[in-house]
Amino acid sequence: MSERLKGNILVTGTNRGIGLELVKQLAEKTGEESHIYACCREPEGVRAEALRDLATQYPGKITIIKLDTSDEDSISGAVRAVSKQIGAAGLNLLINNAAINKPALPGSLAATGKKDMMEVYETNVAGPFLLVKMFLPLLQRAAERDTPEKDKGDKMSCRRSAIINISTLISSIEKCPETFHMAQMYPYRTSKAALNMLTRCQAEEFKTHNILVTSIHPGWVRTEMGGEEAPLTTQDSVVGMLSVMSSLSNKDSGMLLDWQGNMIPW
């Protein structure tokens, strides 16, 4: 279903894991009219080698952007770089994927300090907040352009103008009694709960602009953060998420869904 996604798409945290796979599948499954802006902290670093290799496979389709989501100046620089290329078309889809987790699993109360809480919050919540705030003019520009969706009852879509915040099942307050035994992860789960509120607030604020805002749980994925015991590959998770993104509409804005499209309670 990801072939339904198109336009200018920006993804954060793309040097590895889910972010890298998002860029890969978007490059494979979107048309020539699409362009992917792949953001990471150190585009020239060793950890971004796979991303650089991917960009060379799709010349003119992928642009790597230097971005540290915990640094406001870095975000401003990324906005300027993307704006120069996008022009009047605007930004159709912003995927806030970059996130960190501290301390190491299981992230118990005893092992967690104030510094851990603040660093995780800065990247996982303040970062997406600032990204949306600074990229909003480009998102609005895309939303205001004439598109086939504009004349339909469902005016919102990821093809028009949308923000996707990558969240997690363990952000759910209602599900906490079921998930707490899996991993306590105090900083991570509380930061993602805050990200969910950010999703809900922005969905309310931006609905008059026809900008969709949805949180998506990618599943328990076999990544550096998810660990080797995770049942899902990045490929399967991203296939599912892109299918969900391609079908989102007004009714899904402000919601928390999983990679298969199932609703998760707050």
Map each language-model feature to its residues:
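C-terminal helical subdomain
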Residues: 208, 215-218, 223, 227-266
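Catalytic loop of short-chain dehydrogenase/reductase
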Residues: 100-102, 107-121, 126, 136-207
